[in-house]
Amino acid sequence: MSAEPSGDPFVREMLAAALPCTLTSLDADGCPYSVVVWCALHGDRFTVNAGDGHWLANLRRDPRVSLAIVDTENILRHVAVQGTVVAIEPDPDYEHIDSLSQAYEGRRYQYSLPEDEPRFRVTIEPDRIRTLDFAPPGEAIR
């Protein structure tokens, strides 16, 4: 599949469902490091939000990432993204994390305050996207 997710209805459907995303970065020794994050689509780029921790340090050092978005009702429906971090920007007013929290939890982000924990909007340019939608029409596979 091309790396233009906004043109793919399945990718848009999966993101609109507010499914957990697994982001994998690379540690300094090359080992994969995975975390579960909230993600969104902005144009043809994916965005996630991060505190100033281990995996954000990984992204600053090596911008290669993968994202896996899996339907929690049917694991045979998923999106796999290989991409490159193209921007890491401060989210000083929590505008970005609040929008993700609204999508995933139906409320503003409540786990920290801007003055206590800086947050960062991470933008990922997809290089390759693969999808699997293995469900008979009108049926869920469990």
Language-model features: locations:
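Short alpha-helical
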Residues: H54
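Charged, gly/pro-rich active-site loop segments
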Residues: M1-P5, L76-R142
